[in-house]
UniProtKB/Swiss-Prot annotation:
Protein name according to UniProt: Uncharacterized protein aq_820
Family: To A.aeolicus aq_1211 and aq_1583.
């Protein structure tokens, strides 16, 4: 399965933006379909930023072939991603979702990063959610570890989409060992998404 992917690289202080397709993952490398701009500007060893869906990751060009480019799969401790987001954010796997518990509420997480998560909310829940913006104890279930971790959270935004869905976004505060657990979940999801599995 080929997934629409975007690549950003800097050439002599100019940002080069390329739309291409992710062909898959092989030997811990991400395979992208070659394009004319990739052929012209991409050099082995160059740093590039890979954007797919809700995440953007720093990586490097590993190899160039006539019809494809190989990128190193990003490390588990990436540098700050390009753009506004401080951390990589991924959609929770709908078949095996991340879950959250707080204030007698249990919900599936819509998306998650090391520093935040979003949940879908109904209009009937908004008033109660707005009354409890600061959550002293939140539990997050990570399906890859089959484990609940604990932290605290703070409501930072409420978004409404054209289809009527409402997302409540929370900043998440975790101890470092639990941040690492979330990071591992995120990078496993990145691999699944780029492979086109889920």
């Amino acid at each position: 399965m080929q997934l629409k992917t975007e690549v950003f690289l800097v050439e002599k202080e100019i940002l080069v933006y390329i739309q291409t397709k992710s062909i898959g993952i092989e030997d811990n490398s991400i395979k992208l379909k070659m394009t004319p701009l990739l052929k012209k500007f991409a050099n082995i060893g160059d740093k590039v930023y890979l954007k797919h869906s809700t995440f953007m990751l720093p990586t490097k060009i590993k190899a160039k072939k006539e019809d494809e480019v190989l990128l190193e799969f990003p490390s588990l401790t990436p540098e700050k991603p390009l753009g506004d987001r401080r951390n990589v954010r991924v959609l929770s796997d709908p078949e095996n979702p991340v879950k959250v518990r707080f204030n007698e509420i249990t919900k599936e997480v819509y998306d998650i990063s090391e520093v935040g998560f979003s949940i879908k909310c109904g209009m009937e829940e908004i008033d109660e959610i707005l009354k409890n913006k600061e959550i002293s104890e939140v539990e997050i279930y990570l399906p890859n570890l089959e484990e609940w971790i604990k932290g605290s959270a703070r409501l930072v935004n409420v978004r409404e989409f054209e289809n009527g869905d409402i997302l409540c976004g929370y900043e998440l505060f975790l101890d470092t060992p639990d941040e690492v657990k979330v990071r591992f979940y995120i990078y496993e999801r990145v691999k699944e998404i780029l492979k086109g599995e889920k």
